[in-house]
C-alpha cells in the first residue's frame, strides 16, 4: 500500500513552494504520495509561519488535534517545519513531546535522513540550521499539476525591519545561480506550465551567480529577461518585492518584457515617514510613490497590491491619516493588512505601545473597507472589457464551467462545452467580462485564436 504524507501550510507563497518540495523529496526517497486527509497519512507535517502571533499559536492548536491520531496509529510521524520551527527549535518537542521532527526552511531536503534517524533512535530529530542554499542541490525535479507554478529564486532576508522575524528564521539573503533557476523553469515549461511566479522574501534583491561558482552576477532584471526567453512560458509574476530594491533596470524591464504581467505586489507597510523610519524600512513615502509613478508611465494599467501594518507602536491619528491618503492616491487593488503583532526578539517588540486595541481595530476596519471599495470599483470597471486569462481548470463553484486568472490576478469563471475543457486548460484565451462579483468575475469565451478555436471543436 502506498504511504501518504499530509502537509498543512501556513503563511506565504514561499511556504507553499517549500511544501511542494517536501512532497517531492519524500516521494523521491520513500515513494510517499500527498493526501488531503490527515487520517490517511503516515507522516503529518506542519509548514509554519511566525510572522504573526496568532499563526504561531494555531500551529500548537493543530498539533493538539493530531495527537489523537498518533495515539491511535503509533507509527505515525509528526513534523513541524518552517519559520516557527526555526524560531522555537527543540522547545516545540518540549511543549509537544509527540512531535518527531523539527526542521527549518533551509533543511527540508534532509527530511528523509531525519525520518530514518527518528525510526532508528526513537528520539525526536531537530535540525534548524542555515546551510546556505544547499537544499536546492538536493531537491528532485519539480512535479507540477496545472499551468501555473512557483519558483524560489532566493532565500532569506537581509533587511532586518524592526518588526520582522524573517531574517532570524530564514537567514540572510542568498540567491540561487541563474542557470539553476532557468533549468527549473525550463523543466516546468516542459510539463505544461505557462505562468511562473518567481519567489523570494525580497525577490528583487536577487543577485545570482551566472553559474555555480561563477564570479559574474545576474541581477533580477536579467533573470526576468532570461525567463521570458524560455519556450512555453507566457506569463511572469514575482513576489514579494521591496521598494528599496526597485532599480531603474527593473522598471525598464516592464517596457522590454511583455510577458511580465501588469500586476505588482509592492509592500509599503505604512504611509507615514515617521512610522516607516521606526520600522527601519529604508525608504520614504515619496520614494515609494516615485517607483509607482515611473512604472505607471510605462504601464498605465498597472494593478497594485500591498501589505500594511496598522497600530505600529507610536502610531498617531495623523500617521494613520497619512496611510489612508496613500491608499486613496495609489488606488490599491488588494492589501494584506493586519494589526501590528509584536514578535519576540525583534527591536520593535521593546517599543512602548499605548494605543488601545479598540482604536487599532477601528483603524484596520476603516483601511480594509476602503480597500474593498477600491477592489469593487476596479472589478466593475472591467465589465464589458476583453481580458486575456490563463485557464487553470474547472470552476470551484461549478465544475461544468472553467476558471482562469487575469493579469491583475482576478478569478474569471466562464461557461465552456465539457468536451473542450481538456484542451482549454493551460491555454491563454480571451474572455469578455460580463459581471463583477465581490471575489470573482464572470465572462464569456471569445474565439480569437486558433488554439482556442480548435479547443471548442
Swiss-Prot record:
EC code: 2.8.4.3
Database matches in Pfam families: Radical_SAM, TRAM, UPF0004
Keywords: 4Fe-4S, Cytoplasm, Iron, Iron-sulfur, Metal-binding, S-adenosyl-L-methionine, Transferase, tRNA processing
Organism domain of life: Bacteria
Record's subcellular location: Cytoplasm
Domain TRAM: start-end pairs: 380-447
Residues reported in the UniProt entry to bind [4Fe-4S] cluster 1: 12, 49, 83
Binding-site residues for [4Fe-4S] cluster 2, renumbered to this chain: 157, 161, 164
PROSITE patterns: MTTASE_N, MTTASE_RADICAL, RADICAL_SAM, TRAM
Molecular-function GO terms, alphabetical: 4 iron, 4 sulfur cluster binding; metal ion binding; N6-isopentenyladenosine methylthiotransferase activity
Gene3D superfamilies hit by this protein: Methylthiotransferase, N-terminal domain, tm_1862 like domain
Domain MTTase N-terminal: 3-120
InterPro entries: Elp3/MiaA/NifB-like_rSAM, Methylthiotransferase, Methylthiotransferase_CS, Methylthiotransferase_N, Methylthiotransferase_N_sf, MiaB_methiolase, rSAM, rSAM_horseshoe
Cofactor note: Binds 2 [4Fe-4S] clusters. One cluster is coordinated with 3 cysteines and an exchangeable S-adenosyl-L-methionine.
Domain Radical SAM core: 143-377
Subunit composition and interactions: Monomer.
Name used for this protein in its record: tRNA-2-methylthio-N(6)-dimethylallyladenosine synthase
Source organism per UniProt: Burkholderia ambifaria (strain MC40-6)
Gene responsible for this protein: miaB
Amino acid at each position: 500500500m502506498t504511504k501518504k504524507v499530509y502537509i498543512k501550510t501556513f503563511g506565504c507563497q514561499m511556504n507553499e513552494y517549500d511544501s511542494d518540495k517536501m512532497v517531492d523529496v519524500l516521494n523521491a526517497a520513500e515513494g510517499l504520495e500527498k493526501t488531503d486527509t490527515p487520517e490517511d497519512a503516515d507522516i503529518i507535517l506542519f509548514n509554519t509561519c511566525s510572522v504573526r502571533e496568532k499563526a504561531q499559536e494555531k500551529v500548537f492548536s493543530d498539533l493538539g488535534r493530531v495527537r489523537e491520531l498518533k495515539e491511535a496509529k503509533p507509527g505515525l510521524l509528526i513534523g513541524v517545519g518552517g519559520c516557527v520551527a526555526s524560531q522555537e527549535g527543540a522547545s516545540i518537542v518540549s511543549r509537544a513531546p509527540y512531535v518527531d521532527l523539527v526542521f527549518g526552511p533551509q533543511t527540508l531536503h534532509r527530511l528523509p535522513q531525519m525520518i530514518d534517524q527518528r525510526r532508528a533512535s526513537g528520539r525526536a530529530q531537530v535540525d534548524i540550521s542555515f546551510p546556505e542554499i544547499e537544499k536546492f542541490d538536493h531537491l528532485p525535479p519539480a512535479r507540477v499539476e496545472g499551468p501555473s507554478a512557483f519558483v524560489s529564486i532566493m532565500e532569506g532576508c537581509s533587511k532586518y525591519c524592526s518588526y520582522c522575524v524573517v531574517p532570524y528564521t530564514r537567514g540572510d539573503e542568498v540567491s540561487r545561480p541563474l542557470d539553476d533557476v532557468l533549468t527549473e523553469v525550463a523543466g516546468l515549461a516542459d510539463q505544461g506550465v505557462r505562468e511562473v511566479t518567481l519567489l523570494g522574501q525580497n525577490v528583487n534583491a536577487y543577485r545570482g551567480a551566472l553559474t555555480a561558482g561563477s564570479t559574474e552576477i545576474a541581477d533580477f532584471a536579467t533573470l526576468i529577461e532570461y525567463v521570458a526567453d524560455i519556450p512555453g512560458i507566457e506569463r511572469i509574476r514575482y513576489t514579494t518585492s521591496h521598494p528599496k530594491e526597485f532599480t531603474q533596470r527593473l522598471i525598464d524591464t516592464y517596457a522590454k518584457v511583455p510577458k511580465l504581467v501588469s500586476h505588482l505586489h509592492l509592500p509599503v507597510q505604512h504611509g507615514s515617514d515617521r512610522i516607516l523610519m521606526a520600522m527601519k524600512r529604508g525608504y520614504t513615502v515619496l520614494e515609494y510613490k516615485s517607483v509607482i509613478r515611473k512604472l505607471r508611465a510605462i504601464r498605465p494599467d498597472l494593478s497594485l497590491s500591498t501589505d500594511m501594518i496598522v497600530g505600529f507602536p507610536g502610531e498617531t491619528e495623523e500617521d494613520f491619516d497619512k496611510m489612508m491618503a496613500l491608499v486613496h492616491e495609489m488606488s490599491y487593488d488588494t492589501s494584506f493588512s493586519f494589526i501590528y503583532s509584536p514578535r519576540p526578539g525583534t527591536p520593535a517588540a521593546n517599543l512602548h505601545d499605548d494605543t488601545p486595541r479598540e482604536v487599532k481595530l477601528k483603524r484596520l476596519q476603516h483601511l480594509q473597507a476602503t480597500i474593498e471599495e477600491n477592489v469593487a470599483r476596479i472589478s466593475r470597471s472591467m465589465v464589458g472589457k476583453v481580458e486575456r486569462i490563463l485557464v487553470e481548470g474547472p470552476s470551484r463553484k461549478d465544475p461544468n464551467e472553467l476558471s482562469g486568472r487575469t493579469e491583475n490576478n482576478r478569478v474569471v469563471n466562464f461557461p465552456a462545452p465539457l468536451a473542450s475543457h481538456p484542451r482549454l486548460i493551460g491555454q491563454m484565451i480571451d474572455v469578455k467580462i460580463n459581471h463583477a462579483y465581490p471575489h470573482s468575475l464572470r465572462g464569456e469565451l471569445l474565439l480569437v485564436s486558433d488554439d482556442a478555436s480548435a479547443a471548442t471543436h
